[in-house]
Amino acid sequence: KYIQPGRKVSLEREVFPKLVEEGKLFGYVFDGLWTDIGKAEDYLEINKILLDSLRGRHENVIKGDVKIKEPVFCDLSATIGEGSTIGPYAVLGKNVSVGRNAHIKNSVIFSGVSISDDSLINGAIIGENVVVGKRVKISSNCVIGDYAVIGDNVSLAEGVSICPAKEVFHDVSESKCVI
C-alpha cells in the first residue's frame, strides 16, 4: 500500500508522511546509541565507535608472531597465521581463519570466513562463509556477500559489491556490483 514494487522509495519523504497523516506512525524514546547504517561506510564507522568503547575491556587470545593493533575484536574461535597484522578497527567473527602474512584493518569479517596467505583487506565488510584466496587485495567500502569466493591474486577496487555465492577470479577495477 505504501511502497510500490519496482521502484526506489524514500521512507522519510514518501512513506512516513503518509503514515503520520493516517495516525499510524509511532515513536519510541531510546537512550542508547543509534545510527543509520544504510551504507557500507556508515556500518564500518559505527563499528569503529563500538570498538573504541571496548578498548582495554577485552582480551585477545592470539598466539605466535601476530600483530594486533587495537582496537580489535576477535572471537575466541578465530585463528590467525604467523606474520599477520589485525587492526586497527577489525572484527573477526566465529571460526574465522586468517592465513599467514595477511593484513586486515577497518573491516568486519563475519563468521566462517577463510582468508588465505598474503591477503590485504582494508575497509571491507565480508559476509559469512566467504573464501578469500591467496594474495587478494580488497579495498575500502567493498561488501562481499555470504558464500562468495574470491580467487587467488584478485584485486577489488574501492566500493565493489559481490553478490552472495558469486565466484570472482578476475580483478574488478571499478566500483560496481558483481552479480
Feature names for model-found ranges:
Residues K1-G56:
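Catalytic-core segments of class I nucleotidyltransferases/pyrophosphorylases
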Residues L50-L76:
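Long, charged amphipathic helices and adjacent flexible linkers at domain junctions
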Residues I80, I86, N95, G145-G151:
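Tandem repeat scaffolds
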